[in-house]
């Protein structure tokens, strides 16, 4: 029982260290990273699809996701385009160099 408890504690410490590294060195939050992962795994994705992904487990406010997406776009982690059929829809995606950049971030943490 003690061994299992120690492993859980160590896993939590490792997790906290990874989150701290993400914030300090990469200037990304956990939500930013999850958004990048969702976009990385999709050819293109809408904000609604992002919200229905892993972010549901974090109980993130939908209004904050737009801010996160704008920040990631300004930092050139992602690209976006507006649908020609429905201008309300914005699609987010990554080009090859952005995917490579994300892969490096994921590897570093």
Model regions: which residues?
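Charged, amphipathic alpha-helical coiled-coil/dimerization segments
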Residues: 71-109
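N-terminal leader segment of winged-helix/HTH proteins
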Residues: 1-26, 30-33, 76-77
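Short amphipathic alpha-helical interaction segments
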Residues: 59-74
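Residues within the helices of the helix-turn-helix
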Residues: 48, 52, 70, 90
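N-terminal helix-turn-helix DNA-binding core of bacterial DNA-binding proteins
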Residues: 20-60
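Solvent-exposed, charged/polar functional surfaces in cytosolic regulatory/catalytic domains
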Residues: 11-18, 53, 101, 108
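Residues at secondary-structure transition points
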Residues: 3, 26, 30, 60-63, ...
